[in-house]
Amino acid sequence: MTKANHHIFADGELSRKEGTLRIDTLEGETKYLPVESIDALYLHGQISFNTRALGLLNKHGVPVHIFGWKDYYRGSYLPKRSQLSGNTVVEQVRAYDNTERRLRIGHRIIEASIHNMRANLQYYSGRRGDFDSVVETLRELKTAVSDTQRIDELRAVEGDARKRYYDCFDSILEAPFRLAKREYNPPSNETNALISFLNGMVYTSCVSAIRKTALDPTVGFVHEPGERRFTLSLDIADIFKPILADRLVFRLVNRKQITTDDFETELAGCLLTEQGRLTVLEEFERSLDQTVQHPRLKRKVSFKTLIQTDVYSLKKHLLTGEPYHATEKWW
Amino acid sequence: MQVIVVYDVPAKRTRIYRKLLRRRLEHLQYSVFFGELTAGQVTAMKNEIESELEPTDSIVVFEFDNPHAFDHTTFGDADEPGSRFT
């Protein structure tokens, strides 16, 4: 069992009290959080905190992910690294710098990503429409991945797969939800808003998982390392988005847990309301807790642990050359 | 595993246990704590309780290994135990 995340929606003050976390909300409520039983803290409201609170979080290795206006991801406060290994970072950068090695890792990541997209379509094929031809195309694209010789070529294959995948969304989703076209900054309609929000949550889950290893989150393999971005998190998130985000979008919409009332349209964009975000997060947390039997570990693991094992596998691959098992849906 | 801890100790000594329990568990009611802990956390907690113990103190720790064999109902102003949202 992994520890649970905690989300704070209230506005108020976060402080340290008697060796644990204390929240005083503006409504005058006081609550204590068990700092030793929290995996990661998500701040969604207006919250002030001081260095003593950060020091406590640091001591217990709890990362804080901060969301600003309308729950746009603003950044993370990450505890001091518990895992330090120059060796790992050197190997990671070497692998990145070696075209051959980088490409091989990139292949695994994109193959897994396409595989997971295909698994989603396969599930809904026959239920919500006929996607057999797209499933077949994705199967071909997955095989085409290992033939690519350059990273931009690889990204082109991935983009192609993703486009075909998103094209099926309109048939899977119950009316009035429509994707039409994947757009963000700002999301143009309800479905886009929902996908963007959940992708952000998957991304932060990957940031937390990578932080538990000595890997450098800024050096990714498929995404080009740049400034101010955790490109390795983006790589890992690509594998898990179909499993954790997209599948949840379909479920929330088709079971009518989310309706158009949970969104507000402002200026050019469309975003989730606070109540909507709460509903989505409750379900997201539930899916992180869901377990599946792991063939190599021979025990049940939660989806949250699955992200962790994926990252461990990558690290093992970088250090020892053991094959990297990017998570491909097997259940 | 799911854990419930209740204590009945002299008023002056409550803060000792409150402090060590709050770090790991949700403070549900005055002397009732609930949460999900790992086996290691439970052992550490029990050891810590034991080191603070005096003859006047009474503490009971309940543990449930199977989350499916565990249910709860709340009445009145109670907070939902195990909620991940504030």
Swiss-Prot record, chain A:
Mutant lacking the gene: phenotype: Loss of the 8 Cas genes in this locus (cas1, cas2, cas3, cas4, cas5, cas6, cas7 and cas8b) leads to loss of CRISPR interference against plasmid targeted by this CRISPR locus, i.e. plasmid is not destroyed by CRISPR.
Domain of life: Archaea
Pfam families, per the entry: Cas_Cas1 (PF01867)
CDD domains (alphabetical): Cas1_I-B
InterPro entries in the record: CRISPR-assoc_Cas1, CRISPR-assoc_Cas1_C, CRISPR-assoc_Cas1_HMARI/TNEAP, CRISPR-assoc_Cas1_N
EC numbers for this chain: 3.1.-.-
PANTHER family: CRISPR-ASSOCIATED ENDONUCLEASE CAS1
Protein name listed in UniProt: CRISPR-associated endonuclease Cas1
Organism listed in the record: Haloferax volcanii (strain ATCC 29605 / DSM 3757 / JCM 8879 / NBRC 14742 / NCIMB 2012 / VKM B-1768 / DS2)
Gene name for this UniProt entry: cas1
UniProtKB/Swiss-Prot annotation, chain B:
Transmembrane segments: none
Keywords annotated in UniProt: Antiviral defense, Endonuclease, Hydrolase, Magnesium, Metal-binding, Nuclease, Plasmid
Cofactor(s) required, per the database record: Mg(2+)
GO molecular function: metal ion binding; RNA endonuclease activity
Coiled-coil regions, chain positions: none
Keyword Chloroplast: no
Keyword flag ATP-binding: no
SUPFAM superfamilies: TTP0101/SSO1404-like
A Gene Ontology BP annotation from the UniProt entry: maintenance of CRISPR repeat elements
Family of this protein: Belongs to the CRISPR-associated endoribonuclease Cas2 protein family.
Subunit structure: Homodimer, forms a heterotetramer with a Cas1 homodimer.
Note: There are 3 CRISPR RNA loci in this organism and a single cas gene locus. A CRISPR-Cas type I-B system.
Protein name per UniProt: CRISPR-associated endoribonuclease Cas2
Taxonomic source organism: Haloferax volcanii (strain ATCC 29605 / DSM 3757 / JCM 8879 / NBRC 14742 / NCIMB 2012 / VKM B-1768 / DS2)
Gene name in the database record: cas2
